[in-house]
Amino acid sequence: MKNLKASEIRQNFIDYFVEKGHMVEPSAPLVPIDDDSLLWINSGVATLKKYFDGRETPRKPRIVNSQKAIRTNDIENVGFTARHHTFFEMLGNFSIGDYFKQEAIEFAWEFLTSEKWMAMEPKLLYVTIHPEDKEAYRIWNEDIGLEESRIIRIEGNFWDIGEGPSGPNTEIFYDRGEDFGQDDPAEEMYPGGENERFLEVWNLVFSEFNHNKDHTYTPLPNKNIDTGMGLERMASLAQNVRTNYETDLFMPIIHEVEKVSGKTYLENDNYDVAFKVIADHIRTIAFAIADGALPANEGRGYVLRRLLRRAVRFSQSLDINEPFMYRLVDIVADIMEPYYPNVKEKADFIKRVIKSEEERFHETLEEGLAILNNLVAQAKTSTHEISGKDAFKLYDTYGFPVELTEEIATQENLSIDMQTFEEEMQQQRDRARQARQNSQSMQVQSEVLKKITTDSTFVGYDVMDKASVITDIIQNGELVESAEAGETIYFILRETPFYAVSGGQVADQGTISNENFEIAVTEVTKAPNGQNLHKGEIQFGTVKKNAEVSASVNHKERRSIKKNHSATHLLHAALKEVLGDHVNQAGSLVEADRLRFDFSHFGPMTQEEIDTVERRVNEEIWNSIEVDIQEMPISEAKQLGAMALFGEKYGEIVRVVNMAPFSIELCGGIHVNNTAEIGLFKIVSESGTGAGVRRIEALTGKSAFLYLETIQSQFNAVKSQVKVKSDDQVLEKIVHMQDEEKELTKQLEQKNKEVTSLKMGDITNQVEEINGLKVLATEVDVPNAKAIRETMDDFKSKLQDTVIVLISNIDGKVSLVATVPKALTDKVKAGDIIKNMAPVVGGKGGGRPDMAQGGGTEPKNITESLRFIKDYIKSL
């Protein structure tokens, strides 16, 4: 067999099938597009469903691909076996109703055995088939020439996932020789058995039957081929190494971890597990982030967080106790660059995300592990089970994925009460759900609304005032013919200029009127059958069905909403430009007086980034871009480069809001005709709303001007207060005043020390000998807690062999501090002194053996507490 790099195997595979008339299907992103059934792309065929189910017709019926994939159903095995991975590449050739078994088998055999391609020894190859697949047997035996002893019939060789296409499959195995296992009746030492000798190389699936609802099988009119070859496994064979981890896909990563840790791979079993976990997980994490996923507390983000934290925990067994995973990203990028350039292109961003996540976990890891170790120790002496509440606390407070806790527990032969854990999780979800408020007053669409099929046309893109007719009136959940003044009703217009709340944009408000009545419109939503449903309060008169009316939107509010919505598009584009393409809209609110925009990003924006984004939006406003809005087929919109919002569903015809070249988005909202109409854009806040999501609130036009006017007024007040004439002098004067304050504070603290020292007199006279120890236990008069610590430092420098306990009444609260020379901590501990003394003054405290502090609420007991602690030391 040829000794080939993994990149050469991948390219050979593609080149071979291109020669055989196959089109190359590029590797799709790991985050599925238009497929809600998958968390990740998890196989080579997953991205080709559109061809197999007939939704799309490929340019050619013959397809070849190398598809990156993620599978996380057995994460806990990764690191402990030779070939388990969370990220892998699947090489595959596919036929959509073109060739079938004969060609598929012949192609596979030629690629594996031909000197031009893989040059495998034919005598080392074995195959498995389904017992009833006579055609596959005939092809292997008669056409390929495999003797019967190398064709193994296995009942499990049938691909079936329930209703739909199914069929037998044939698997090709490579015999690695007796070094990897000898014949033993007690072991499954045969192709298809659980062993290390016969490795599966390729799986060919012959999709020729339809699995019917009644569990019968009928032949498919068009038969398909679906094959899969794991690149990592093939690389281990071509490079003649024992496991996938010794291939050129992993070893450069492992070598870098060796440098960081000072440990050597393949010298210690425990170390090897850590090396493999890290090498596997960093590939998954880097590729997932490159394809748009970010660490979070749910969904894909939770998988990433779990993998990263698992890798960090295993890195501790290599004595790596600081963020380092981010340093491996460049290695992954270099290894995979020939076929996957996007990891290198996004390397800086990927590293920032990983480093930020590592730092967050390291902050709580030590404390969390200490708690978990205590829980493990307790469980071993009692129930051999970690309680669900404790597991939930580790998850909720310390960021420990429950699977990580479970894995550690399993290694210690313990279990976790998962039922209670799930109950705690559900309670948290319920609390979150109750905290969310529904912004629509009609939360449940009644049967009455569903029955209304009257046509209603929205004309508000073009006009704000429209003559119309009230076609339906709903009051108290029922259709009515009329309603009176003071009553609240829902109603539908034949034509309406009122925008219904959608896409983050609030509904229009305004009036519906004629000479007999007036309705103040307060809310507009979408009815079940697509009409705009208006809610309003009758100001005067009697409203009747089929009444002719004048519908008028509040012009002032509509103009402000338009400005804010168009500014939101500019903001989205600016964020992508400044922060990176990973930015996606995660929610928005467009109102008359402000806009709010939520977006995916891994950490707080710097002030420089905020300023740059704000300036870019204003520059596009000043550029006076004409806003072109058109409806077109979605395929045309995509060719135009229109940005679709992640997670939104679109029809065949879409509305494109074009502020080219800066912003092109699919949007059903209302916008300005020219960006100059926005006037001014000002960001007023940037904050986090949850893991991986940031929020910007901003103002436009008059609201932005009034905000800046307020800021200017406040600035002028500060300028007046610090008594300077020009704006440029304000900062300089404030810095000068702060420096003065620091110096005065320093002088005051020194004076306080001197006063305290004078009050205390010669402290050596107050030292007592108790139980063979020199002890100074006394009350001090100090202004604050900082001063008591400074007094302690002063006393320690003078009494280096003395146990010192100081107590003070500071504004009605008791402050305690104790120190013990390290040479004496085997006799008495500062932490124990404070733990025993603090309750006497109505408080608590603790600390290290050499230093501890505490507090209390009962200063009247200070004298008693000093007497108590002297007696305590005497009793030791």
Curated annotation (Swiss-Prot):
Free-text cofactor note: Binds 1 zinc ion per subunit.
ATP-binding as UniProt keyword: yes
Subcellular location: Cytoplasm
Cofactor: Zn(2+)
EC number: 6.1.1.7
Gene3D superfamilies documented for this protein: 2.40.30.130, 3.10.310.40, 3.30.54.20, Bira Bifunctional Protein, Domain 2 (3.30.930.10), Threonyl-trna Synthetase, Chain A, domain 2 (3.30.980.10)
Catalytically driven reaction(s): tRNA(Ala) + L-alanine + ATP = L-alanyl-tRNA(Ala) + AMP + diphosphate
Predominant location: cytoplasm
GO cellular component annotations of the record: cytosol
Catalytic EC class: ligase
Function per UniProt: Catalyzes the attachment of alanine to tRNA(Ala) in a two-step reaction: alanine is first activated by ATP to form Ala-AMP and then transferred to the acceptor end of tRNA(Ala). Also edits incorrectly charged Ser-tRNA(Ala) and Gly-tRNA(Ala) via its editing domain.
Domain comment in the entry: Consists of three domains; the N-terminal catalytic domain, the editing domain and the C-terminal C-Ala domain. The editing domain removes incorrectly charged amino acids, while the C-Ala domain, along with tRNA(Ala), serves as a bridge to cooperatively bring together the editing and aminoacylation centers thus stimulating deacylation of misacylated tRNAs.
Family named by the database record: Belongs to the class-II aminoacyl-tRNA synthetase family.
Record's protein name: Alanine--tRNA ligase
